[in-house]
Amino acid sequence: EPIVASTSSFSEGSSVFGGSTNLVQSIETIFSVYEPEVIAVHTTCLSETIGDDLTQIVSKAAEEGKIPEGKQVIYCNTPSYVGSHITGYANQVAAMVKFFSTATLKKRNVVNLVAGWMEPSDMREIKRIASVMEARTLMFPDMTDVLDTPLTGKYEMYPKGGCTTEELKTTGDSKF
């Protein structure tokens, strides 16, 4: 599946002195070239080992004006020497909740379906079953209409579908 991904391009120097400069530059470049609403950053084995501090780096990028107004950078730690790819996926999903979920004390009769490591077809089936049960749900992440879609002959950098950031903000008010 075509997924837009970028790298901060560690060099020998950043391997020794840290990747802060590279990541701040990458954040600026990604926002200026690709114009996403959100950038999700995760660490690697090397950035974890040398001690890069994502909170500090993203704060620095914001202070320097590298994150445009209304845009967001979410992040999490995913050292490859802890757990597996599933652990990293779970950490990034937790970051989605941490950075977006808010509670207004107005409970919504909605069930949050937090999707674990699974295929888009499995997500689609879970949503279908919930629909048959007439349950109001919000699945996140939701890759059913973003990945596992028919070929149209036209490339879309950001396919329509999934859970929006506005929907993610409501998860703190869900009943379950």
Predicted features by range, described:
Residues E1-F176:
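An N-terminal assembly and electron-transfer interface module characteristic of large anaerobic redox
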